Amino acid sequence: MRLSKNFTLSEITKSNTAKRLGIKNAPDKEHLNNMQILIRDLIQPMRDALGPIRISSGYRSPALNRAIGGSSKSQHCKGQAVDIQFFKKGEMCNKEIYDWVIKEEIEFDQMINEFDYAWIHISLKSNGKNRKQILEAYKDSDGDTAYKVADI
């Protein structure tokens, strides 16, 4: 199923972990609707402006989210978030995604610079107010993932 001219449902639901563990990673109608809005209003415009965007993690069923140790409040489980990467001429350029979203004042709920631009987590609520929250992920002194508000 095509979600936009450049993105498919299989691309946003693909998970090697789900495949390996035999976990069904299929969205219900509400989550599918959320994914269509996320792709249409945020990810496809980004793709049109910047070029090919790779979705490294998209929709996660609750079972898959538990298996990978994801947050119980993860927007991935609602079909409202993706983790993405952008490569240009074979080089990772994820900061360009981050900068583009800020410059273009694109509507989003949360954007996280994950570990010095290793990937970008970005979400969009289908209904309700989007927070436009910008965070940076890092490892704290105990080696746990922590988040801080980004300086922009």
Specify the residue positions occupied by each region the protein language model found.
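Extended, low-complexity, intrinsically disordered C-terminal regulatory tails
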Residues: 43-68
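Catalytic cores and adjacent binding grooves of peptidoglycan-active enzymes
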Residues: 86-152
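Structured loop/turn residues at beta-strand edges in well-structured enzyme cores
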Residues: 51, 79, 106
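Short beta-strand
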Residues: 56-57, 75, 110-115
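Charged, often glycine-rich, active-site loop that binds/positions anionic groups
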Residues: 63-79
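Extracytoplasmic cell-surface/polysaccharide-interacting catalytic and binding patches
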Residues: 1-47, 139-152
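Catalytic and substrate-binding regions of cell-wall glycan-acting enzymes that process beta-1,4-linked
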Residues: 81-84
